[in-house]
Regions:
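Positively charged, low-complexity/disordered segments
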Residues: 175-178, 182-188
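Alpha-helical transmembrane segments and membrane-interface helix-loop junctions
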Residues: 1-173, 177
Length: 188
């Protein structure tokens, strides 16, 4: 790490911008999901015709939106934490909790998901897995690939936040939340 935290800041800023860009693109999935749900409901109740592929598409779109929303939430600090306790702690204690939370919980969990997710995707690809439902969606490996990819992005976002938190502890000592907000890219 550099003595002034500049290298960490550049890396963190790059990852933040990437996460915000991907999160912005993926956010349109919610509009598409809404359209698919409305179409499926109209087909089912107005025309008595259920479409398996639309139902499966709903599940897949929701999964993609949720999975890629994790890194966006971490980048924008909009994830859930125990604020009742968190707000009572000193900025330095919050920074240490953030640092150890990322190191001991978030990064190992991301590593496990990627480690076990990649063979899951490869197996699906190798056998040409398709939906078991008649009329279901093909290329099941594609939706399964969103799991390790999204968790790789989440891990990169966590590392960026970890570096920023570490830099705050070493050089400036504000809370990581304050430092995070002051270094956030101005446009998504």
């Amino acid at each position: 790490m550099s003595s002034d935290g500049q290298a960490e800041s550049r890396f963190s800023d790059f990852i933040d911008k990437l996460s915000l860009k991907i999160g912005g693109m993926v956010s349109y999935i919610w509009v598409v999901l809404l359209g698919v749900i409305v179409t499926n409901v109209i087909l089912r109740y107005a025309f008595s015709e259920g479409r398996i592929e639309l139902e499966e598409l709903q599940w897949h779109l929701y999964s993609i939106g949720f999975l890629f929303g994790l890194s966006f939430a971490l980048t924008t600090d909009s994830h859930i934490r125990v604020d009742i306790l968190h707000e009572k702690f000193s900025p330095e204690l919050r920074a240490w909790i953030e640092l150890y939370g990322i190191l001991l919980f978030l990064l190992p969990f991301c590593a496990l998901v990627v480690l076990f997710g990649l063979p899951f995707v490869m197996s699906s690809y190798e056998v040409g897995e398709v939906s078991a439902s008649p009329g279901g969606l093909p290329f099941r490996w594609l939706i399964k690939a969103s799991l390790p990819v999204a968790f790789l992005l989440l891990a990169a976002t966590a590392v960026a936040r970890l570096l920023r938190t570490w830099s705050c502890l070493l050089y400036t000592s504000p809370s990581p939340r304050d430092a995070h907000e002051s270094r956030m890219p101005s446009s998504a």
